[in-house]
Amino acid sequence: MLPRPLRLLLDTSPPGGVVLSSFRSRDPEEGGGPGGLVVGGGQEEEEEEEEEAPVSVWDEEEDGAVFTVTSRQYRPLDPLVPMPPPRSSRRLRAGTLEALVRHLLDTRTSGTDVSFMSAFLATHRAFTSTPALLGLMADRLEALESHPTDELERTTEVAISVLSTWLASHPEDFGSEAKGQLDRLESFLLQTGYAAGKGVGGGSADLIRNLRSRVDPQAPDLPKPLALPGDPPADPTDVLVFLADHLAEQLTLLDAELFLNLIPSQCLGGLWGHRDRPGHSHLCPSVRATVTQFNKVAGAVVSSVLGATSTGEGPGEVTIRPLRPPQRARLLEKWIRVAEECRLLRNFSSVYAVVSALQSSPIHRLRAAWGEATRDSLRVFSSLCQIFSEEDNYSQSRELLVQEVKLQSPLEPHSKKAPRSGSRGGGVVPYLGTFLKDLVMLDAASKDELENGYINFDKRRKEFAVLSELRRLQNECRGYNLQPDHDIQRWLQGLRPLTEAQSHRVSCEVEPPGSSDPPAPRVLRPTLVISQWTEVLGSVGVPTPLVSCDRPSTGGDEAPTTPAPLLTRLAQHMKWPSVSSLDSALESSPSLHSPADPSHLSPPASSPRPSRGHRRSASCGSPLSGGAEEASGGTGYGGEGSGPGASDCRIIRVQMELGEDGSVYKSILVTSQDKAPSVISRVLKKNNRDSAVASEYELVQLLPGERELTIPASANVFYAMDGASHDFLLRQRRRSSTATPGVTSGPSASGTPPSEGGGGSFPRIKATGRKIARALF
């Protein structure tokens, strides 16, 4: 505090101004600039006092709503000053829909619960519809007609403010289905506004006019497609004609447009998680468009490296262009350069699409082609793979995204390229799968309603935090300044991607299993380890079979000729970084649990070759490195803290046979309290089956080495499951079987006989021992 005489000397302010009473320098790292001025002489002390003020928190229930009340008791520094009253704030935690609408239109909400309106408008589609919400708002306003005029005017002004904010931030909510309720609101607002005579009517008239323009929109002129249906398919190997940076710019242009058109509320777990249910095919169109573009890029990578074009849906309806391994290596290097350019453009969506496609089963098994790739390309590919590692819940990609938003230069530390000019702009396109996973996990971990039926609005606040981050990134995405290249876009539109069966068949024709020379046995080959969170990114209902982890079975066993399978088995305890996918889960995947074959090989640990096949869902087990003749042992799910004991919940992936409809895979959240019957019932409900017949089914865990672990009917699934895998199978009980539940090494879930897989019989173990001895000595 400055002495009083000095303060009087410094008082040069006009009458009514503020006198500088104290000064305190501040650290620029703490914000506030290089220095800080304190006006009034007690602000810094008050801030320190507020931090030490005791806090009391409790819940209050009032008119169908539960509020969380936070009270702070501040103590004055001067003991002679009387104790001020405590400062309290209320946040709505849960309530009925009517109570939420009352709180929304309450004039006190904007001052005490600041984030309520934004969170409510962003997440209301998860628990109600727009017409229902507009109807409740009209009911609330009409109920206040008998109240004093000033209260009605204040509430009407709040309603106009809410509708204006709603229209500005979520215009997509006002479709034709809301027309009836808008007519009702228009009649009330205009009547009340003109009667009040204080300008409310004019504001409401402008608002209704804007709402009408959204309800009856004019059909926009759709751009004409560059590639017409009758045009011949594009040659996927023409990717070599385009410059890598030009192709990356066009991919970024398409991804940025889709991301800007993304409606964040459609990413909510309550909507995205129900998209496959009957009658819900219209849900989340903006998210589906982003997923389709992701799969289109991945399909272009697979088709071009294989040199194949689909001419139909059948496995044999493919046109293959003969390519030698060095030529395929040039295609691999080309796509790696494209991914690097996308990384420089901060287009993480296309980076992940290219990387995941190069890690897919049909591509990463092409050892001859990868062996011809240059060392620099493999180094770049390895660094790109590390960005999307699932370690610590994608911590690397999350931190990198935050850093890239702050930085102006999009260069990687290892990149030798000079910064681009500012002509391309400085936007960012994130990988949407990370946000979808967060929202689906929030939806699975928290209940929609409390025990008394109140809407759990605390859950909606957490979801709103993720949606706000998406909104912020959309604003950053507007920084791009890219021009379309019709030649590249026409080529992308003209590609006809291969189906999963086609891509695997072509890959095996290009390099038959066991025909290519194996890599030198000088490094251990870690097995693939897949995290349990990928299924939450899930399918969109449209099969896109380009990027998956299915492992088709080979015709029979083949004898190894090198020690590589031995080294593979010795290294299976090591964890290899993996990435998840944002692609469609297949409706039918009969080969998911078939034995691993030489087409599903992991790369050496010290080599940046693709680490494993791309997967569409989590917990699909560890693909077994090596040939089908080797039974994989060891741990299939490595890494410290990755077993069931690492947390109190796990996401398991359950396959259910649906007869002629094939197989479907669902993710189920299993907690430490869940018993087998409840898990089986939830799986049946997710597959639209009657949960009353749960007693007729059994839950079987699929373990590495084609082993099975039958979960007893009375067992706790969380503690009974083996940490080596998160793959499960739901099947009808075998009435004629008398075997006790437990681990078996017989046929797998796909019905493969033990002789075709990796059975644990003594003759097979003995034969394997002889192979190991020959390999070592």
From Swiss-Prot:
Q: Which residue intervals define the domain Ras-GEF in the entry?
A: 243-513
Phosphoserine modification sites are S13, S409
Q: Which PROSITE patterns match?
A: RA, RASGEF, RASGEF_CAT, RASGEF_NTER
Q: What does this protein do?
A: Probable guanine nucleotide exchange factor. Putative effector of Ras and/or Rap. Associates with the GTP-bound form of Rap 1A and H-Ras in vitro.
Subunit and partners: Interacts with SAMD9.
Q: What is the name attached to this protein's record?
A: Ral guanine nucleotide dissociation stimulator-like 2
For this chain's UniProt record, which GO biological process terms are given? negative regulation of cardiac muscle cell apoptotic process; positive regulation of phosphatidylinositol 3-kinase/protein kinase B signal transduction; Ras protein signal transduction; regulation of Ral protein signal transduction
Gene name of this polypeptide = RGL2
GO MF terms on file?
guanyl-nucleotide exchange factor activity
Which regions are flagged for Acidic residues bias?
A: 43-54
InterPro entries per the record? RA_dom, Ras-like_GEF, Ras-like_Gua-exchang_fac_N, Ras_G-nucl-exch_fac_CS, Ras_GEF_dom_sf, RASGEF_cat_dom, RASGEF_cat_dom_sf, Ubiquitin-like_domsf
N-terminal Ras-GEF domain: which residues?
Answer: 88-212
